[in-house]
């Protein structure tokens, strides 16, 4: 069905225009989702430990952020903004993440919530300090 849609769009809009437009949309979508993934794991005071000191529950709750974003944006991200509960049990389908998060909020009180305004600060945390077992900012 998807390939038939591409063929139809190529005939309707022209091959070069369709592929140019499609490539731009695909690239911007991928870049946005990579940024969201990065922000949900790299932020100030995120839980990060060496393998021998890793704790599964702390890693799930303290090592991933939840996003405090508008509902319309959350719809585009398929509720992955409720990320800590996803790390506790990755088998929860996206359409149940919000309900599971709310039902287990008492377990997630220490989890980090980030706003859109916090995103730019997260991109500084890319260096691993092995001695102190934490991410440190580049500036």
What are these regions (language model features)?
Residues 64-79, 119-122:
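Alpha-helical membrane-targeting segments
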Residues 36-45, 76-92:
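Histidine-centered catalytic micro-motifs
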Residues 63, 69, 90-91, 129-130, ...:
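Generic structural "secondary-structure junction" signal
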């Amino acid at each position: 069905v998807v390939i038939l849609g591409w063929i139809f769009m190529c005939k309707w809009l022209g091959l070069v225009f369709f592929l140019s437009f499609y490539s731009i949309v695909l690239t911007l979508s991928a870049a946005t989702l990579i940024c969201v993934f990065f922000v949900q794991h790299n932020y100030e005071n995120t839980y990060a430990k060496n393998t021998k000191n890793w704790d599964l529950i702390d890693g799930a709750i303290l090592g991933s952020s939840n996003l405090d974003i508008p509902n319309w944006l959350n719809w585009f991200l398929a509720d992955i903004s409720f990320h800590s509960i996803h790390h506790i049990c990755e088998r929860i389908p996206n359409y149940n993440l919000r309900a599971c998060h709310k039902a287990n909020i008492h377990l997630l009180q220490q989890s980090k919530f980030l706003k859109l305004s916090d995103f730019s600060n997260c991109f500084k945390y890319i260096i691993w300090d092995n001695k102190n077992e934490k991410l440190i900012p580049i500036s």
